[in-house]
Amino acid sequence: MQAIILARQDAATGLLPASTAITVHGDYTHAWVRDNVYSIFAAWALALAYRREDPPLAVPLQASVVRLMRGLLTAMMKQSHKVERFKHTQDPLDALHAKYSTQSGDPVVGDSDWGHLQIDATAIFLLAL
């Protein structure tokens, strides 16, 4: 648990990187929305299981889930202006970004440089709130 989940979570933003690899194909240390949303549910489910079987182990996982949800929400709130535009245009260029810097929560690619329209991941995240 510590080595796989908690050690990889950024201390400042709470976001998890997609990987720790930087290869010729790209920098995978960024936080993808979909990966972080699924990580939220995985850590939450694990925390629920530990809460019943071994309560002291549940505490750091619960804190990890809160940090991760706050980090993702903060990254999305930095782009609130895009949400308003997207409501009117429904243009993928106005969609929330799909990947963020793990260290700052800021977008790491431009609006037209990546397929940002990931409404499914954003919707699941909002339901979890």
Residue ranges, per PLM feature:
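Acidic, mature catalytic/reactive cores of soluble proteins
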Residues: M1-L129
